[in-house]
Amino acid sequence: MLQPKRRKYRKEQKGRNTGKATRGNAVSFGEFGLKAIGRGRLTARQIEAARRAMTRHIKRGGRIWIRIFPDKPISQKPAEVRMGNGKGNPEYYVAEIQPGKMLYEMDGVSEELAREAFRLAAAKLPIQTTFIVRQLGA
């Protein structure tokens, strides 16, 4: 699963996920892309589950790029622990997703195969997505 090798600080504040993606919003590597329409968080497990769904569908053909990385730690306190006594320990990592962000890219497969693979991947994700084809000159 994806997670940072090391961080300057173990814990991070919650923050607010606002605005639209200004970077990483175009198909840069492959021919087809899966773009986020909605806003939210993707955990490392969700990113991996979607990747596996795509990889299994396209079998040996094609190449997949993951354009997001879960770099924000989410901390949780254990079950049935009283309030107070500090912040909980980091349990998992998430990627904050803004509308317009390119999540995955694919190349070396037909459009029908890519569309179906992205449909299977999108079913694993908690945000709305759309299928994008690379424009000429972009």
Curated annotation (Swiss-Prot):
Superkingdom as given in the UniProt entry: Bacteria
Annotated SUPFAM superfamilies: Ribosomal protein L16p/L10e
InterPro entries: Ribosomal_uL16, Ribosomal_uL16_bact-type, Ribosomal_uL16_CS, Ribosomal_uL16_dom, Ribosomal_uL16_sf
Skewed-composition ranges (Basic residues): 1-13
Pfam families: Ribosomal_L16
Gene Ontology CC terms: cytosolic large ribosomal subunit
GO biological process: translation
Protein name: Large ribosomal subunit protein uL16
Gene: rplP
